[in-house]
Amino acid sequence: MKLILSLAASLALISCASLAPPAAHGTVDHIVLIWQKRPGNAADRHALLAACADLRAIPGIKFLDAGTALASDRPIVDDSFDVGLTMRFDSVKSLRTYETDPRHLKKVNEVLKPQSKRIVVYDIMR
């Protein structure tokens, strides 16, 4: 019985330790929601996701992930967008540098803007 309790306690501690640590003070989360000009077009969606992934090479980005909207019946959830991008920067300065980086501007002008009818950005600072 002691062994079972000991194992249960160990597993509980391990599961708590697997949570991501809180973001550091001064970091910025950059959230981009994109509505496609041709909603549901798989080739366009793939091009948008690939363009987002290419941005990983830009310095100052601590985290980048992109995906599609999760359908929801909850009235509070806005699932009307097609592609979402979440990024974390180590500072406001890094975000500002990213915004003017030629690689970012190229993807915005050659892929994101031409294939998007709407783009909404949220920046969250800690």
Labelled PLM ranges:
Residues 4-15:
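Bacterial N-terminal signal peptides
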Residues 30, 101-104:
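Histidine-centered active-site/metal-ligand motif
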Residues 53-56, 103-108:
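A common structural junction motif
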Residues 96-100, 108-116:
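Short, exposed beta-strand-loop hairpins at the edges of beta-sheets
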Residues 13-82, 90-96, 123-126:
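Short S/T/G/P-rich N-terminal loop/turn motif that feeds into the first structured element of a domain
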